[in-house]
Amino acid sequence: MVASGFLLIASFMLVLFVLSRPLGGFLARLIEGEPFSALQKVEAGLWRCSGVKNAEMNGWQYALAILCFNLLGIVLLFVLLMTQGSLPLNPEHLPGMSWHLALNTAVSFVTNTNWQAYSGENTLSYLSQMAGLTVQNFLSAATGIAVAFALIRAFARHSATTLGNAWVDLVRITLYVLLPIALIIALIFVSQGVLQNLDDYLHITTLEGVQQTLPMGPVASQEAIKVLGTNGGGFFGANSAHPFENPTAFSNFVQMLAIFLIPCALCFAFGQVVGDNRQGHALIWAMSLIFIVAVVVVMYAELAGNPHLSPLGADSNSNMEGKESRFGILATSLYAVVTTAASCGAVNAMHDSFTALGGMIPLWLMQIGEVVFGGVGSGLYGMLLFVLLTVFIAGLMIGRTPEYLGKKIDVFDMKMTALAILVTPTIVLLGTALALCTEAGRAGILNPGAHGFSEVLYALSSAANNNGSAFAGLSVNTPFYNLLLAAAMFIGRFGVILPVLAIASSLVAKKRQPAGNGTLPTGGLLFIGLLIGTVLLVGALTFIPALALGPVAEHLQVWLAH
């Protein structure tokens, strides 16, 4: 079993690097604005039809365009979800959502969180799934990548004022990257048995004579961008544990690769655009080391099982509760770490049924900001925030002004870095405290003790860090949780994006200084170790007290009692 686990991890990482390296080169061309002659006429037609000027924008113009674009998306999706009962492509005649659930869902999908306080097959029409959620899966992913593009340009350029054009970036990312790759992935899923139709639901009689309804729908097309764009929202309530959504071990492996594909490729693109591939490789090494350790810990915890099952005559050698037998513990553990290291949130098992230690690692990966590969775009700019913090700390230790890639890191940059890093932990801890201190918040907790606390902490961590997965034992389809989590998702998304673009606006105007004798090398093993240490230190200082009250206490209760 140990050998199988390491073989699975090694094969996954190998295939990931083989696929992401050439994609990184393609993304680098997009970042640098190299024209694609075959598609220039298509682009020109789009600009004429939309009336958009493709002149470059400064930092605040870029930020305003991104913010307005996403606010408009929230409004349009909210209206669609509220009125779906009166719209076509609704074979089950499902009514519109309540206003607070519609608001929560609209904010969720526009912010790339895909938190779902509902079950898709019982709540949403085909039109809402296709024109609402799937469209936002593309656009929210494009938003994150566009912000990463702007920050990469800020490091690559010097003595400049512009970061690119937000509209051009959004269109090119969608047309040249997301749509073609999503089409390929969707066809792979269809070949594996994932549904793709607009048929009415099937009403059948089982062998036992019981009536059963089988949901249908355009699943594969939504599933492809769900994983590629690190969105995570499932067509069905069971998400990727549902056999109509993720039927085979191969489709499961493809989903995991798709989740990490663009985040890993962006690291390669970063190194290429700034003119030093070692910079991108250093980020990949730091991310990979944290990721591999996290996977090993989860596999170990789930294989250890629950010792209290043995006296009951059950097999306690491994924890198969909440898992699909077609995937097994190893692939399920890997999927759980992939989806929470990235800001995806798709699940092929119930995280609420993991062991205390096995559930703590996905929770912690979200809490450190999902910078271990992370979401499309957000993972890279999140890790670059930790890079700036690392060079600042290193500069303090040696008594030099911190710099990165020849750019001096000044007071404004560090203020924005601190704001971006601290905004999500603040939301998580304050939101958890609010839920536990109010009757409406406590009413949703279905499990007592440490695990009930972990469910609330997980929900806020998932929402604020735009992940979307859940410990499903928490009842969240209430006005209190829908509004609280909607606020957490919105602030967690744009409370990081706006400071990142402010940093980009500051860096792009600076001159590039030649490296001196006292310059900290940022492409070697020493810096990789410092970066990992900084990520772990910030995560430890921020969340150890909360984790001690939840999963740590639960783990000790289980094993010390045994």
UniProtKB/Swiss-Prot annotation:
Subcellular location field: Cell inner membrane
Keyword Transmembrane among record annotations: yes
Biological process terms in GO annotation: potassium ion transmembrane transport
Main localization of the protein described in the UniProt heading: membrane
Function field: Part of the high-affinity ATP-driven potassium transport (or Kdp) system, which catalyzes the hydrolysis of ATP coupled with the electrogenic transport of potassium into the cytoplasm. This subunit binds the periplasmic potassium ions and delivers the ions to the membrane domain of KdpB through an intramembrane tunnel.
Subunit structure and binding partners: The system is composed of three essential subunits: KdpA, KdpB and KdpC.
Protein name in UniProt: Potassium-transporting ATPase potassium-binding subunit
Species: Yersinia pestis
Gene that produces this protein: kdpA
